[in-house]
Structure formats: structure tokens, C-alpha cells
Amino acid sequence: MAVSKKSRKSEPSAAFTAADGLVLDQSEIMRAMLAAQKGKQKEESEGNDESDEEDDDVSNEGEDEGESSGSEAESSVAAQRNLKRRRSLSFELDAEGEEDKENEESEPRPQPSSGAGMLSRTALATKDMTPKPRSKPQPNGLPSASKPSADVTFESLGLSRPLITALASINIKKPTEIQAACVEPILSGRDCIGGAKTGSGKTMAFALPIVERIARDPFGVWAVVLTPTRELAYQLSEQFLVIGKPLGLTTATIVGGMDMMKQAQELEARPHIIVATPGRLCDLLRSGGVGPGKLSRVRTLVLDEADRMLTPSFAPELAYLFSQIPAKRQTCLFTATVSEAIMELANKEPPAGKQRPFVYRVASDTLTVSNLKQKYLFIPSQIRDPYLLYILQNPLEDIDVALRVDPKKAKAREREAALGKKGKKPKQAKEEEDAPSVPSTVIFTQRCATAHLLHLLLNSLDIPSVPLHSHLTQPQRLLSLARFRAHEVPVLVTTDVGSRGLDIPEVAMVINWDCPRRSDDYVHRVGRTARAGRGGVAVTIITERDTELVKIIEDEVNVRLEELKLDEDKVLEGLNKVSLARRMATMEMHDSGFGERQATNKAKQIKRMKRDAAAAGKA
């Protein structure tokens, strides 16, 4: 149904409208955001006594690592006091803005004074760890199309031969369930809401039909893909480039932290696909750096990681972008965790004469893949360092044999075998080559300071690692990801900025240094391993502060974490070495002025806000 000129004039961004008349109403999206905001305000009013630790506050690092004093009884009381609040927080997402500020909650809690001596190692095991009976995680009333046939092929979905050939070149020969369900409806122009586990091929589910439609009728800017993080934006651009380059498609990646003039020039060149974070794209459009009408012919809008995008913090940018993109367009939402905002959109009765968007969610009893082995390690917070070192230097038996050796060495042997090199190597050299090395590992922390400190700590212990957090410049962040992907270093230490959407092949293990505060954060973190049918291991370190929290995560995700038992005597043999390395890493962080730039920017922001408030008061 065409949008009348009168209604378009009075409400320039009144609706998401697909090519065949399907509508995702923008007003409903905004209502969902406001509902989420009210829930967040209620949470804040209930928990005013909680304090958020700033990422750039290095001086609080010792407190975060559990070095403050207190009684075990006080710790237990604090845990019980916060339990009710945490239960309501389990599925709520914090918005991540354009500058990728991690606003993770890290609650200061009293700690036992004697460390290991004050903690019973059987305390967690004696608790009732059996998950409560839980229905399938599919939200009640969420409409979903029927499961596609197992015989579906890319050709039967309507993709052209050149695109199928491009997929074969990257070893994609058969569509996954989410791809088989969503490619055809998106290809026909329908709006779509798709949900599936991490590593199930959601990106290709919307990328393939977009590329196919552009190849049939290429002109100007056809599609805009919005993501919550910069790293995910670059990854999506790479995937569009791989499948679209043989067809002559062009893309532009528009994110913060990079040269705005260069990005403005890229937009002036009218790429077929724009992959962007909302803040930077809005800045370019508002500043006049891009000529008017550059987005006037956009036909498809995609919100990737839609549960994070449909939060109040992104509402102003999305509202502005809606007004710049034609009202008559196709809209696609994809996510691994279905939030209340998405459920509202899926269940909303469409306007008269309209249909609901096509909705498909991969049904499952759990929110994590079956080939992922999930374990917990229950230890005092003060001795996490030696346990981390031991796990990295002694790969777990659950890790696939193929991932327990250096990927570079394995690939070198494959090349030699392909070339027919059969020369025998000395026995000692062969044993050294086959000896288990540090597996490809992603370590997640709550705070930027913790991530950077662990990175320095591991490097001083001769375990090469790279950091990924918002205190790094964008080129530094891209370099860290590139080195980890190329297997130059075996360990990536990151905050939750690296938990969403990043597809890093051959990650053998994920370690949660800090227990996630929400179950959906847990799902996205552990989803960095066991992708595309591969195996993987996730180890969550649980301290005396997290015993109730892990039970909530088990209930929400519908899994039972298996206890990881290690020889404590062997682990603590490296305690002195690790303690010395931590002191050296702490001094190096202090000398480097870590977080000073962020502290200066924050002070300027506070000063500017006070000045604006004073000016508003005078007016």
C-alpha cells in the first residue's frame, strides 16, 4: 500500500514498509524502547546503593580483583541483598553507544580477609545446582514460520549461479536452518525478524538476499546495515565484500574512531551497501559532510544484534536515521537473544490491510549449541591468576585435538603433506612440534582496566596476547583482531565489546574471568567458540561473590555447568611467578598513563553538561 503524501509530510518516518506492503511500525519500535527505559529506571530506583565502577579507574583495580577486606558473613548478606535485583536483570541489556563505552556493572562487595582459607571449595557443590524446570526459550506467543525442509539448497532458494559459486569458494555449500528459512522471504521483499543461536549463520541469512537483489538491479545506496559495535561492522563489511566482489558490489564501513572526511568521500561515491554504527552515520548526515539525498533510495534496512539496537540509548540516532531513509523500505531484524522489544514487534497486531513481518526463530531447548562443553571453576578471587596460567599452559582434554596445537604448525604440516614432502624429522623435533601449545582462547572481563592488566600479565608470562576494549583507538582494536585471527597470538583479552557477532574461526576456548551479570551476556560470550559445527569449551570462573548468580544463569540458559577440577598443588606451584608478573604489569599500566585520555574526556563532558544546564536555567 502506498504511503500518502499527506501522511508522509506530517510523519516523515512513520513506518518501516516493505516492498510488498508489510509494515514494522516505527511508533511501536519507539514504544518498545520507552518500555525498556522505564524498566531500566525502575531497576535504578531499586538499586541506588549500587555504584558503577568506571572503566578508566585503574586505582580501583585491586578492589575489583578481590583485595579489599571484610567478613565472610558480610559478603553473604550482600549477595542475598542483590539477588532479587539480579533476577530481574538477567535478560536486560545495557545499550552500547557509538563510542563503545562498556557500562558494565561491577558492584563493590566486601571480601574475605584470608583468601583461600575462608572459602570452602565444596560450598558451590553442596548447593542445589539443578536448573529449575524450564520451557523452551522461545517466547510465549512469538509467531514463527514452520521449519524448512532439510533438502533446501541455495539454488532452490532463488540465488543465482555466480553467488552460489562465490559461496562455494569460501566452503559454504548448504544453507543453515536460519538461512533456509529467511533467504527466500527477504529475497521477495518481505520484512523479517530472525532469531538463532550464535554461530548459526544469521549474517548470511540477510546478506545473501541483499546481494542477490542488488545484483539484479544495481543502483546507488541499496542497503543500510546498522550494528552496535565497530568490530562487528567491519566483520559484516568483510563478509559482504567476499560474496559481493565477484558481482561488482561496493561497500562502505562507517564507524567512530576513523577519519570522517574519508568516510564522507566513501558515502559520496554511493556504495551499494553501507555498514555503520548509528552514531557516526548520524554525525556525517547532520554535519553536512554528505550531500542531501544520499539515502533517499535505500530499499533495505537491517538491524543486526537487534536486541542491543532496540534500547533507549540508540533511540535518538535511530529516529533520525528513520527520517533520512524512505518510509517505503524493507526492514530486517536479526539477533541471537530475543528481547521484550523484539517480542513486542513480532506480536503486535498489524494495521488494517497489512501483514505481520516474516518471523523465524530456530527452536531449541537451550540457548547454547550442543557441541559446546560448559564448565565452571570455583576458586577464591585472589588466586585466579595461577589458575588462568595453568589452564592456558595445560589444554583441557575436552578441547578438540586439532585445536590443541599451534594452528600455524598444523597448516604448515598440511602444506608439506600436500606437496609430498615425506622427509623424516628428528624424533625430538617432532615431539616439540606435536606438544600441546596455548589453544586459541578468548578471555572476557567486565572492565577495560582488567582486560589490559591481564594482557600485560600474560605477555610477561611468555603467553602472547592482545587486548580489545574501548580505551584503545580504532586502528589498535582492528590490529588486535587481525593478529588474533591470523594466529599470530593465541589469546585475545576483551571486554563485552568483543562478545557480539564476531566470527573468529578456530577459537578453542572461552574463559569468563568475571562471571557475566546477565544470562544473555553469557550466551553471547560463550558463542565465540563452538561455531559452525566445531567443538569448543567455555570455562566460567566463579568466586565467592558469584554463587547465586551462576544458578540464575543456569536456569535462564537451561544448562547445567560441569565443575572443572584441577590439581590445586600443581596450580599453585606458579603462584610466586604469577604474583611477581602481576606487580610488574600493574606498574607498567601506571607508567603508561592508562585511562588518562578517557578521564580527561569525561571531565570535559561533565563540564559541558553543567554549562548547558546553567544556560538552560537562565533561559
Curated annotation (Swiss-Prot):
Listed SMART domains: DEXDc, HELICc
Compartment(s) of residence: Nucleus, Nucleolus
Region Disordered, residue ranges: 1-149, 414-436
Composition bias, Acidic residues: 46-67, 93-105
EC numbers: 3.6.4.13
Annotated catalysed reactions: ATP + H2O = ADP + phosphate + H(+)
Single GO cellular component term: cytosol
Pfam families associated with the record: DEAD, Helicase_C
Record GO biological process: rRNA processing
PANTHER family noted in UniProt: ATP-DEPENDENT RNA HELICASE (PTHR47959:SF24), ATP-DEPENDENT RNA HELICASE RHLE-RELATED (PTHR47959)
Protein name: ATP-dependent RNA helicase DBP8
